[in-house]
Amino acid sequence: MKIDKTFLLDKAKVCLSPNSSERKSKEISLLVIHNISLPPGKYGGDYIEKFFTNQLNSDDDPYFEDIIDLTVSSHLLIKRDGSITQFVPFNKKAWHAGVSIFKDREDCNEFSIGIELEGTDETPYEKEQYNSLIMA
């Protein structure tokens, strides 16, 4: 995979999130890998995409009531089948790390790339996810 001139992966599905902003610095020095599943422990569907684009419907699952007002995103989502969706170009700040500090530097979103793996802390990831993570 290659990053094109618009800072998007050439083989990723693009679903741009409004939950991003310009970076103050161009230096990227941190990769943050998270996991997510919506509803928790359930895989497939488009709830993560809806969540990152502020289109989640709280009537679809009781859990969504707790997160409906959050405005978050990541640069990439790698689903269980290894497919990649990009929400924020790499030259912009995705809102994935919240209030954060790494090596005495605050606001990790400012100098990091955020990648979400569809999954949970308790469930092993799929081989396809690891392969896509390596390729990205």
Name each model-derived stretch.
Residues 2-24, 30, 37-135:
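Active-site-adjacent loop/helix surface patches within enzyme catalytic domains
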